[in-house]
Amino acid sequence: MTYTKDALKEAIQQKLRLNYGCTEKQATDGEIMKACALALRDIMAVRSVDTQERTQEQQEKRVHYMSLEFLMGRSLMKNAYNLGILPQLTQAVEDLGFSAPDIFDMEPDAGLGNGGLGRLAACYLDSMTTLDIPATGYSICYELRIFKQKIVDGQQVELPDDWLNLGDAWLMPKPQEAEEIHFGGRVRTRWDNGHLMVVHEDYTRVLAIPCDMLVAGYNTDHVNTLRLWDAKSPKPIDMQLFSQGQYLKANEERAMADSISTILYPEDNHYEGKSLRLKQQYFFVSATLQSITRQHIQTYGTLKNFHEKNVIQINDTHPALVIPELMRILIDDAGLSWDEAWDITRHSVAYTNHTVLAEALESWPQRLFETLLPRIWQIMQEIARRWQQKVDDFYHDPRKTEKMAVIWDGVVHMANLCIAGGMAVNGVSALHSDILRRDVFRDACGMEPDKFRNVTNGVDHRRWISQINPGLDGLIRDCIGDGYLTHAGHLSDLDRFADDAAVLSRLEQIKGDNKQAFARWAKRQQEVTLNTDAIFNVQVKRLHEYKRQLLNVLHIISLYQQLQDDPNMDFRPQTFLFGAKAAPGYAVAKRIIRLINSLADQINSDPICRDKLQVVFLENYRVSMAEMLMPASEVSQQISTAGKEASGTGNMKFMMNGALTLGTLDGANVEMHQVLGDENMFLFGLTADEAARLRQSYDPYLLYTRDPVLHRVLDQLKTGFRDGVSYEDLYQRLLYGADCPADQYLLLADFASYCAASHRVVDTYADREKWNRMSLHNIARSGIFSADRSIADYADTIWHVPYKK
């Protein structure tokens, strides 16, 4: 069916009347935005029903993608784009007397995530839909998305950020499909005719209400669903307590249930926080599996073929309880034997690992399981016992048994649970997967080598090129057509235009226009004036020490000191842009944010630096900001310590938009280097193997004493800047360590190499033809990092499902 401008206009008007009791003349911008969303939702709902009926009739295998994070960003433009009606929707809004850009800008980011993990899940859901794979995403319907970051006196302050006020138009609550989750209580068992009968009693009940968000694919009628679970108590308010004036007590159970879906990643440095996190994870897993198995039984009448018709992909270890919960359903509810249930489970679940950091491998105290999840704890103990026996029989080595244990010394290790109960374990870049095999999970890989795979991450190139960068999209279409939108590999055809002066000139003009557009946006949003004649040198990502925002800062300090020494030196203007949120409990990361703002205040107020050097911290970095920033960026800083970044996806988005990478051979940078070569990116620093060897005898203090530039830069941390704040704690952390080894992430070891590479960036930028050619090569060779390719890899090697080629 074709949707014209007039048809959409009429649909929006109807939604205003039926849902908000007003006409376009009375409607607010927010009501117009929600009416647009409802109109698009109706289109997708019809297609969703058709998709479900087709999947049911053909008995197709289904993919269930479980992730505690889904950073969907804004959906109005994205869904309109995928449905092929963005121009018509834009004109319909304008005809109703509203500014389409203003209406699109009204939509809050659906920030149901913290960073790359959630954005990856969103990209993958888009690609699964575009490739016609029957898939459902699952997560929690958080009331408050990731916090809103406010910078006050240079420091991060976290504010609650309610997205549902305007974002709920996309959600379709389905209370009739609610699931009941049980916490606490006690478990009784008895044998009856050779079968173990399990009785769970005296538990606390929580209802999981599904709220479905429809996802349209590009150039297809296929529509998939993101199912978000909202937690509610089934108990009404205690009227007796309420009538006695005990208002809080009367609402206690309701409040406890509501807290499960209030916020992503509650602080867990205390028992209550850990308890709430574990409740969140089990709530999410149990609701999802009950829903999946119920649907499967309705179709097939049995769970014995569950693994033949379903595959569950868990995005990191947060949904790892899917393994014992599926066992519980198969044994307790379906009456299968342990061996039958285990065979089904280990052929149903696949695990994606996203970290090599030991501290990030999730673990839980045993007592939490015993208290909150008594039946799951029983099943976990049996899984752990059988797995430990298998490891013992294979290795006969107590050290390996301990390292691979699911439960050891009162601690539950979730990654080991995923390995024990999963059919596949994949890393997210070639280097990362190699490190998992050789180091992190070496013993498990030695025992079950066929279980370990690699699927390099990818991003939704339609969103991150065509939708957000229409100028570049137009250039690509003029050069090679629009086939790249469904076959990203076609981007390689751009390479043949590398010596076309007109194409390179147009590419430079597009970048300049995007810089101007972002500067206007930054002025409106943050009242900052950017120097658009400067190189836009960008580092935006979650704030973590291994991502080394501090290394970037040290280099900027050295540039500032050079200008102080010689204000008249030849200095190509640079604007350094940072965007990062620190986890609320991560004190060191928060200190680095304050340091960036102290440095920015010093440099931006010093007349010596005017029109030469600028530092800006972009407040509240989010998906919609990235969509403005990435087309305008010229240098992409991907400078993590080699061997620490699993993959990264920001690096891919910058590459697709023609920014040149300044980076280490880490994560997906390695594969970028394979397609770009030394000549099209700026590499520096130690390799992962070199970093591992250096740590055995590393002394950062020696570097401090031998390098006068580094010495002076670090001393500046102690002195601080004009705001009077000293950063001696960071100085001490780098040189002597604190609760960690000195310079744990090798900033000082890579400092000189990083400065030299940064100098090469500036020198190369002066040769505009060369720079633009390098930029074109980056765009041309970025197709391998499309999420479509990633999903095809999963479909071929792990899920074994067909997809649209």
Positions of predicted regions on the chain:
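A conserved ligand/cofactor-binding region detector
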Residues: 1-805
